[in-house]
Amino acid sequence: MNRALRKVLLQAGGVARFGPGAVPWRTLGTVSEGNNKGAQQHYDIIIVGGGMVGTALACSLGKNSRLQDKRVLLLEAASGFKQPSIEQYSNRVSAINKNAHRLMKRIGAWEEIERTRIKPVLKMQVWDACSDALITFNYDDFSDNISWIVENDVLLASVYRQLETVPNVEIRYSAKLADCTLVRDGAERSTVQLTNGELLTCELLCVQSL
């Protein structure tokens, strides 16, 4: 999860169609240009995709004391977030390593995850496909759990609840991406075109697939 967060930070430069690749960091600044659909709306950071990575990134940025004066927009294509059923288990789960565990604790989501439903991994066995070689990791070999298994819906719900407490992060549902361009070589801004015709601009554009 942390690896995905690091890979998705994209910054703009000359106009180019959206594609992979990182561009140099530059200072973020806030510019207000109105909120009507006919005008460009400017944000410091736009995150496309409200899955686990996108919401965790938005929450982490919003709770960063150095970025509290920056406007962050999270775009989610779904019509809204549905709270998971406590009684019904989901078979869509993720293994949370210690880096992701620290991230969840830092943004305040881990305590709720623990209260809802979680299972620690106490033993792991890795073997070679072409031989009988294998290695086993046991809980007894470490001072902490190897990792934790968490349902995706439980993790997402906990992070969304933390997002509700962050004033500088805006969430838009039913926001589907039609096109976007990145800026290169000193051009001013990245642009995001939504399917409803809205045009958004930003200093930093992050696109998530998870």
Report the location of each language-model feature.
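Alpha-helix termini
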Residues: 32-37, 62-69, 166-167, 184-186
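Glycine-rich FAD pyrophosphate-binding loop
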Residues: 48, 62-91
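Conserved N-terminal helical subregion
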Residues: 116-210
